[in-house]
Structures are given as structure tokens and as C-alpha cells.
Amino acid sequence: MPANELSLEGKSILDMCCGSRMFWFDKEDERAVFSDKRSESHTLCDGRKLVISPDLIADFTALPFADGSFPVVVFDPPHLERVGPNGWQGKKYGKLDRETWRDELRTGFAEAFRVLRPHGVLIFKWNETQIPVSQIIALTDENPAIWQRTGKNDKTHWIIFVKGAEAQEKAL
């Protein structure tokens, strides 16, 4: 759906790279705008269907929303730079460009904070199987409020940021 046709009425959460909405309790949550640059479906190696069907096709580096549009933003970008062209992990999680991922993620953080309201919450998820989370956090000047490691070998990081009011004042 084009951004100009999408109503934000009742929408309080932006998932800026939703993929197949894997961690969502309700994959059709009416409070959320599900955005991704991909819209595709695949049959995985075990026969399961993988469907990436966002409400809005948009790149997380150039979100089509006004500043301060959402009180909650979810940012779970692709975390793999080494994955085969037909590999199931690339289909499921997306793929980073080896040359540009730092700039893309830096811009993604900036966009997340731009569309986030003052005192809003950014939920950031990263799996450091290939790229250490320390390299990712260095791409934003914002400081996390909460940081939790989960998953196999504690490689998945859930990092919560709270946007300060001063960030909005700087943008004005």
C-alpha cells in the first residue's frame, strides 16, 4: 500500500522492517503499521511457508512518516552479511550489503528516532551471529535504557531506548 493511502488512525506502533512478523503475538495487531522493503513468499527447506506481507513497502532508511508520528518503534533489521542467494536465512531475515550496512543501519537508527515521539520507546533487536552488537550500537549516539540478551548462546540482544524531549527540540 502506498504511504499516502495508509491511515495512521489508531496506529501507535511502527515495525520498520517487519519481515514475516516472527515475534509478534498477534501478526495482524491493529495498533501496528508493518513496514518492510520486501513483499514475497517462500517455501522453506522444511516445507513451511514464509510470508513477508507488510502493510507498507518502505525502506527503513527513508520512512514516509512525519517526525514524531509514533510512540513506539520496533527496529529489527537484517543481521546477516554472509548468506547465500538462495539460503533460507537470507529469505527469512534479509541480508545486509557488505559495503553499505554501517551507513544503512546508522541511517535506520536516525529514521527510527526521527519518527519516534518525545519520550517514545524504540525496541531494537539484534542477533550478533556475524556482526558484534558493539559495532551496531556505535552507529547511534542514543544511549539504551534496557538491554537483555536471549536466545541460543545469548547472541540475540533486545535493546530498549527512550527518546528524550531534547532530541525533539534539536530537530525543530
PLM regions: where:
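Class I S-adenosyl-L-methionine-dependent methyltransferase catalytic core
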Residues: M1-L172
